[in-house]
Amino acid sequence: GPCNVVDGVAIDVNPSIYEAGIPVIAAGHDKATCAVKLPQFTDDIEAIKAAVKPFVFETCKAEANWNMTNFVNDQVELVRRQVGNRKVLLALSGGVDSSVVAALLLKAIGDNLVCVHVNHGLMRKGESEDVVEMFGNQLKANLIYVDATERFLTKLEGVEDPEQKRKIIGGEFIRVFEEEARKLDGIDFLGQGTIYPDIVESGTKTAKMVKSHHNVGGLPEDLQFELVEPLRQLFKDEVRACGVELGLPYEMVYRQPFPGPGLGVRCLGAITRDRLEAVRESDAILREEFRIAGLDKKVWQYFTVVPDFKSVGVRDNARSFEWPVIIRAVNTIDAMTATIEPVEWPILMKITDRILKEVKHVNRVCYDMSPKPNATIEWE
């Protein structure tokens, strides 16, 4: 139903309107009815603001007093109230969400934050090393490094279903944290970088489930921690603004998003180590060439996937039967919708040439042209 209802006012409306999948604002003002229907699939933030502004500020007499400084101060106070003098264990992947959560929790509780970086073997090339350097050496955070590569890959052997992979990875993450917590004294809370799109896409009473998110749907029933999720009200662009407000460096705040399950949802189907390596190496080439071309600051998210089937090709004047690599590059404002980035052909040709020459067991490169919707940003 509606998020807010005025006391004493009956809501005389067909309840199915709240399950229609279309954003709707409706209000009864005296005997007049005011409603705003927003464009369902658009990244035009200014158009959305123009549609909502008269209703919010003229009809409802709202005041424009929300800003990121106030949000940070409010969340710091809320975290202090929730946690007190106890300790929080944070899953620090080094991505935007977990980095901003770490900075916010450090501001709120200081040394009572214990950061754990788990290398599950599904990280991008050199990423775990970067996390240790940035957080352990530069930011001087209380950082514990856990190499759980063999543990995760063994659990994932033969698992094809993407939902099952996500739940295995999410559940194993929590169990690793539980084990680390037993080695420490007084860990009562688990910090998470859950943001608003995670909540929406994982399903609510009024939203159909799209996919389970690593921060939401993978938690096991025997979870022994109380959750601390200070970013759950924010969209991705607001998370970045929060990071800037907290003083994090540009390269950390504006790095491209990376899913919790990592390359596990980009090595499609059952994960094999050789195909996982093909994803990692092709992704590294794509990121390097996008940086050289200046696209790393223009494109919101870009990555490669390797499916669990092969294609016929020619290598060294002989028939080859090897994997394709699929490139995906999208732009979005809030991660709820996404458009395709029209990358220039010379750049794509250079990337293709490098992947075919440098990545083992690959004989074909494709470019994904599917927007969100109908496709999601990730393949799994």
PLM feature spans:
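RNA-binding accessory domains that recognize and position tRNA/RNA substrates
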Residues: G1-D188, P197, G203-E380
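Extended catalytic-interface subdomain
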Residues: Q192-T194
